[in-house]
A protein has these predicted regions:
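N-terminal binding-site loop/beta-alpha segment at the start of enzyme catalytic domains
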Residues: 1-69, 270-273
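Short, acidic/polar
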Residues: 24-36, 81-96, 140, 144, ...
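Conserved acidic residues
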Residues: 41, 99-102, 154
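Acidic (Asp/Glu)-rich catalytic clusters
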Residues: 7-8, 56-68, 90-99, 148-150, ...
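Acidic-and-aromatic substrate-binding clefts and catalytic sites of carbohydrate-active enzymes
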Residues: 24-26, 46-54, 78-83, 111-114, ...
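Short acidic capping loops at alpha-helix termini that bridge into adjacent secondary structure
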Residues: 65-69, 99-104, 132-133, 209-210, ...
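Glycine/small-residue-rich loop that forms an oxyanion/phosphate-binding "nest" at active or ligand-binding sites
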Residues: 74, 78-119, 123
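Beta/alpha (TIM)-barrel catalytic core signal, keyed to glycine-rich beta->alpha loops juxtaposed to Asp/Glu
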Residues: 109-273
Length: 273
């Protein structure tokens, strides 16, 4: 069976996380509790999601010890100034009800703030023990290299799925031993109707979502954080950890990247690779 964790600079991270974007209120609390009870040990949230209080409640409701869980959150670029980074992080820790985050990311590039200032502030939080590791999100390859030259960037969270090639970003991640965390691994559901994934899934008595995730998780330094709206979907996604694709199957899925479908491209996004 494929490994359920990856090792980045000697630190083990669960490959498959539970994403909480657009999950708020009681739904956030219940879905996080359910995910942890199913066996997830990696939870992803963000200040911008407006659900950190409920995510923290779900963690406590699950009974899973904090030290068994990888917990990631993100600072919004409006808070990229040094004082704001610390203020945001302290509020996030309080809302989540934890003493330390495993990983804190800058959610998007902040063009009006020197990157060195933001990374130095994140590094200070790391030095003070408030976060274990620091990272970035939605950074194209050139910006990731710049960040990695300034600080020990642990992860870059970006959109990545079988319809979107991220070779340049992956290359930069490999150069600097940076984890790539894939969000929107199903391309907002578009992948789930793909005939190639359906054919491969049938051969393994699996589902297209499991094939999509297995393809990602087989790649070096890649983790994924799918969102799921039901217990059944969360369990289904977790089943991807037991699926191993043949090399020809992996290549067939990878060939779909020529579509270059990007689903997250707001007006403030950087120039992509």
């Amino acid at each position: 069976m494929p490994a359920s964790t990856l090792t980045v600079r000697g630190i083990e991270v669960p490959k498959l996380g539970y994403g909480t974007w657009q999950v708020t209120g009681e739904a956030a609390r219940e879905s996080v509790r359910d995910a942890l009870e199913l066996g997830y040990r990696h939870i992803d949230t963000a200040r911008m999601y407006g659900n950190e209080v409920e995510v923290g409640e779900g963690i406590r409701d699950s009974g899973v010890p904090r030290d068994e869980l990888w917990l990631t959150s993100k600072v919004w670029p409006d808070d990229a100034r040094a004082d704001d980074v610390r203020r945001s992080a302290e509020r996030q820790l309080a809302d989540l009800g934890v003493e330390r985050l495993d990983l804190l990311l800058l959610h998007w590039p902040a063009p009006g703030v020197p990157l060195a200032e933001t990374l130095e502030a994140l590094g200070a939080l790391r030095g003070d023990g408030l976060i274990r590791e620091l990272g970035v999100s939605n950074f194209p390859s050139a910006m990731l290299r710049e960040a990695a030259a300034l600080a020990p960037v642990f992860a870059n969270q970006v959109e990545y799925h079988a319809y979107l090639a991220q070779d340049a970003v992956l290359g930069a991640c490999h150069e600097h031993s940076v984890m790539l965390t894939a969000y929107s691994p199903f391309a907002h559901g578009r992948l789930l109707d793909d005939p190639v994934l359906a054919e491969i899934a049938a051969a393994h008595e699996a589902t297209p979502s499991q094939v999509a995730l297995a393809w990602l998780l087989e790649q070096e330094l890649v983790s994924a954080i799918p969102k799921a709206s039901s217990h059944e979907r969360r369990a289904e996604n977790l089943g991807a950890l037991g699926l191993e694709l043949g090399s020809d199957e992996h290549d067939r899925v990878g060939a779909l990247r020529s579509r270059h479908l990007r689903t997250a491209d707001p007006g403030f996004a950087p120039a992509w690779d």
